[in-house]
C-alpha cells in the first residue's frame, strides 16, 4: 500500500463564508399530541422503537446529522402499555424527558423509574432499554447530540 501524504491547501487571505442562519422553528402541543397518537397506533417495529425525529425545515441543507438545531436532535418516542424496546447502546449522550405516562429504563443493569415530567440521563456506551409497565401510553422526548457525532463521522451505534 502506498504511503498517504497530507497536502497543503493555501488559504492565505481567504475568510470563511458567513454561516446561513436558521429561522426559529416551533412545534406546538397539538402537533406532539397528533404524533403521539399516530405513533401509538403503529405496529411495534422490530427494534421496539416507535420514534420520530424532530428536525428543523432547513436541517437538510447540512446533509448528515438532522436535528432541530445543528448538533442537537430531539426525538419523540412512544411505548404502549406492556411494551419495551430492544437493548441498544451508542456513544451519543441522551437526556430523556417523560411527557406522558410512566415506566422505567434499565441502564447498565440499574433501574430508573420515571413518571410524567421526570427528566433523566445516562452515560454513553451503556446498554439500555425503556419499558412501559403502566396501563397508559408512555411518551418521552429525548434530546441527543447524535447529529454532531454523525457530522464528524464518529457516531457509534
Please identify what each model-predicted range represents.
Residues 61-73, 80-95:
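A short beta-loop-beta micro-motif enriched in histidine and acidic residues
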Residues 84-116, 126:
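A short beta-strand-loop-beta hairpin characteristic of the jelly-roll/cupin
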Residues 148-153:
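A short beta-to-alpha transition loop/helix N-cap that caps and shapes the active-site region
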Residues 54-57, 75-77, 96, 141:
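Residues in well-ordered beta-strands of folded domains
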Residues 134-135, 154-155:
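Short amphipathic alpha-helical segments
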Residues 80, 107, 113-134, 140-145:
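Conserved metal-binding segment of the jelly-roll/cupin
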Residues 1-71, 156-157:
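A short, N-terminal "cap"/entry segment at the start of jelly-roll beta-barrel domains
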Amino acid at each position: 500500500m502506498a504511503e498517504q501524504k497530507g497536502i497543503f491547501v493555501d488559504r492565505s487571505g481567504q475568510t470563511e463564508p458567513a454561516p446561513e442562519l436558521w429561522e426559529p422553528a416551533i412545534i406546538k402541543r397539538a402537533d406532539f399530541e397528533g404524533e403521539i397518537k399516530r405513533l401509538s397506533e403503529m405496529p411495534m417495529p422490530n427494534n421496539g422503537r416507535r420514534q420520530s425525529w424532530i428536525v428543523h425545515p432547513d436541517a437538510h441543507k447540512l446533509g448528515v446529522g438532522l436535528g432541530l438545531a445543528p448538533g442537537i436532535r430531539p426525538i419523540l418516542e412512544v411505548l404502549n402499555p406492556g411494551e419495551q424496546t430492544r437493548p441498544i447502546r451508542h456513544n451519543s449522550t441522551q437526556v430523556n424527558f417523560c411527557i406522558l405516562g410512566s415506566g422505567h429504563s434499565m441502564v447498565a443493569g440499574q433501574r430508573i423509574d420515571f413518571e410524567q415530567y421526570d427528566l433523566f440521563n445516562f452515560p454513553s456506551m451503556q446498554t439500555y432499554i425503556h419499558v412501559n409497565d403502566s396501563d397508559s401510553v408512555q411518551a418521552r422526548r429525548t434530546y441527543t447530540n447524535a447529529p454532531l457525532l454523525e457530522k464528524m463521522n464518529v457516531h457509534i451505534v
